[in-house]
């Protein structure tokens, strides 16, 4: 009799355990969207972002770095050998995933010191760790200019908020093309 009660209690215990709801926020939906950027050179603050207008979502990385130039002036300012590495945190260097109640204009939302007021963030996840690597690949060189492809990659990043945590070992934010005068 005791064995039967024990088995019933054990079955009820396992049946009552729950892993909770599985929430999957696809971070790879941004792969076809254009990488955009802006900066405030006086404050040494920079933002790279992609926006999925179909779902009103954005993924952005903002950081402060006194040595980084969003538009390098010379070829000497670009290294194809070593990427620029920025350590993410919860305050100054962040990867942000946001969902909005309406579509947004990236320049208006990310590039103004005061964001537009008629847009509400319905979900926000903020990085708690990880790194951002900004790497350059030589595309073409002429007598007057050099063209690079710049890739923004997050490594070992965790973004969290509202009881949700998402971890990615590798997440490519996007690429853009920059031209530097020789």
Predicted segments with their positions:
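Flexible beta-edge/linker motif
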Residues: 146-148
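Short beta-strand segments
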Residues: 57-61, 150, 167-171
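Edge beta-strand at a domain terminus
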Residues: 153-182
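Surface-exposed helix/loop patches within compact recognition domains
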Residues: 52-144
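Short, hydrophobic/proline-enriched secondary-structure or compact coil segments at domain edges
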Residues: 43-54
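Bacterial Sec-dependent N-terminal signal peptides
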Residues: 14-45
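Sec-dependent bacterial lipoprotein signal peptides
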Residues: 1-17
